[in-house]
Design a protein with these regions (language model features):
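Anionic-ligand binding patches
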Residues: 2-10, 17-212
Length: 212
């Protein structure tokens, strides 16, 4: 069903990089993306769900309820099979502890992977996305993206908020994930490319705009 008017949708994160990722997902659709800061809302979540999808749903429900609006939220993490139980993708950002900066997280993961070689260094990205309206879930997805490998050394220069993407390499392209062009991301059929298709299909074919 076509969306008749521009509808506000809350980007349920304070992370500017993720806000930009959400904007790219919604680009061309009849929505007005707004940030929590722009509408003056906040929400608290535990983020202790058993899956990325459960965590994304928790975020979407909390933020959509806090803002009394439509909200889109996500949760993701790096899947590193060789580390087994020593690594949980859900704790990618927090694996070094709560008070560690992104630069130290890069160093810690590089050190953790030092004993591994070849395919043992392979890693994929799991990403979940959820959409809710005023505390009610209306859609959610979780998928596993392309496979790259963990770099042996940290990159030079400042580390962005999505720190792990600076050491998640794609040797066939000679780049880390954060250096890939839109065309290269498309060629990899990466997680955001696939989520974009799902989101667009949902909003263009399934979504019924709220009446209140």
């Amino acid at each position: 069903m076509p969306i008749p008017d521009v509808i506000p949708i809350l980007l349920a994160t304070g992370n500017s990089d993720k806000q930009q990722a959400f904007r790219s997902l919604l680009n061309g659709l009849s929505f007005n993306p707004v940030t929590p800061a722009e509408i003056g809302v906040s929400a608290s979540t535990t983020e202790d769900g058993a899956t990325h999808e459960a965590i994304a749903i928790e975020k979407a429900l909390a933020w959509s309820d806090a803002g009394s609006t439509l909200a889109i939220a996500s949760d993701g993490g790096l899947v590193i099979p060789s580390l087994g139980s020593a690594w949980q993708s859900r704790h990618t950002r927090r694996f070094s502890g709560p008070d560690v900066n992104d630069s130290q997280r890069v160093d810690d993961l590089v050190e953790l992977m030092e004993p591994f070689s070849g395919e043992e260094r392979n890693a994929s990205w799991a990403e979940a996305l959820a959409i809710a309206y005023k505390g009610r879930l209306i859609a959610s997805w979780e998928l596993l993206g392309a496979t790259g490998e963990i770099a042996r050394t940290r990159p030079s220069g400042p580390i962005p908020e999505f720190w792990v993407f600076t050491i998640w390499n794609f040797p066939q392209l000679g780049k880390s994930y954060n250096q890939l062009t839109p065309e290269e991301l498309l060629s990899l059929n990466d997680h955001w490319t696939r989520l974009s298709r799902l989101v667009r299909r949902f909003f263009q074919s399934i979504f019924v705009p709220p009446l209140d």
